[in-house]
């Protein structure tokens, strides 16, 4: 039976990288009897605003709700500005509507050959390996707010509930327990200032103690963690959890460690991937890069996002791992886009990965 994948290319480079993800998945389907896909394309973001006036058309949301998984390219661009209707509203809405409460962003080196591209010294960057787990549907991004209506006052509010924090803590614990020995959990907050952070810290501590006593959790203030991330990133190896906005910031900081935003994938899940069939939305960590010429964007992050989809949502661990291996082989061979010091185009990198994964699975 084919897996139904809704593809939301989005804006600018999102169109190109979505094509490359489909290319490698179709290559896998040629050699793996289990891997059969039905791709449905829909609009989101600025392209959706241009066509329909809405950043997330009803038909796109309805299709996503019926799909086995969603692949998303990238959303946004200066064309749509910061007006009342913005591309990013489509992202926030689909996350909320699909109850995608946990965003997973691995931070590691897809290949050791990329160490020299890190802005950090190799001796500091080598061995960096953690997963940032972001609470995705609560906090200040979804709290009450007031716009400046001419009185010169605007505000946003952060609200978290105990069940919301428990849920994201259980996701972190599940991921930690997939390793032997289990990985440590780092919980980042601002408990010395914010009431919401004090609830966060208390709830994380209680949940781990009562439900996962075999795990260790370490609490770190977010500003201190940001410093550690640059000074000694391997100190944070393991699973990192924090609130929506803090994770948005810290994960972008972490994303530059491997040398390019074009390398890091992400998964947004609606449940624990304990059966390898959790519903999820998969997208690269980078944005839509509107200034990048055609054929220059690195498709690796999008392709690795597809690998995460295979493993976490489609119960195709063998195929997902083969795709990750193919990416490593291609990068090691020197086939790279310009952000990695190479001269290959987007499609050439995709072609090479598609060829490599077929050879691995054949």
Curated annotation (Swiss-Prot):
One of its GO terms (biological process) is L-leucine biosynthetic process. Binds 1 Mg(2+) or Mn(2+) ion per subunit. Transmembrane segments: none annotated. Its EC number is 1.1.1.85. It is an enzyme of class 1 (oxidoreductase). The record marks 141, 190 as: Important for catalysis. Keywords: Amino-acid biosynthesis, Branched-chain amino acid biosynthesis, Cytoplasm, Leucine biosynthesis, Magnesium, Manganese, Metal-binding, NAD, Oxidoreductase. NAD(+) binds at residues 77-88, 287-298. It catalyses: (2R,3S)-3-isopropylmalate + NAD(+) = 4-methyl-2-oxopentanoate + CO2 + NADH. It comes from the Eukaryota. Its cofactor is Mg(2+); Mn(2+). Gene3D superfamilies: Isopropylmalate Dehydrogenase. GO terms for cellular component: cytosol. Pathway: Amino-acid biosynthesis; L-leucine biosynthesis; L-leucine from 3-methyl-2-oxobutanoate: step 3/4. GO terms for molecular function: 3-isopropylmalate dehydrogenase activity; magnesium ion binding; NAD binding. Substrate binds at residues 95, 105, 134, 223. The keyword ATP-binding does not apply. It is found in: Cytoplasm. Belongs to the isocitrate and isopropylmalate dehydrogenases family. Homodimer. PANTHER family: 3-ISOPROPYLMALATE DEHYDROGENASE. NCBIfam families: leuB. Catalyzes the oxidation of 3-carboxy-2-hydroxy-4-methylpentanoate (3-isopropylmalate) to 3-carboxy-4-methyl-2-oxopentanoate. The product decarboxylates to 4-methyl-2 oxopentanoate. This is 3-isopropylmalate dehydrogenase. The gene is LEU2.
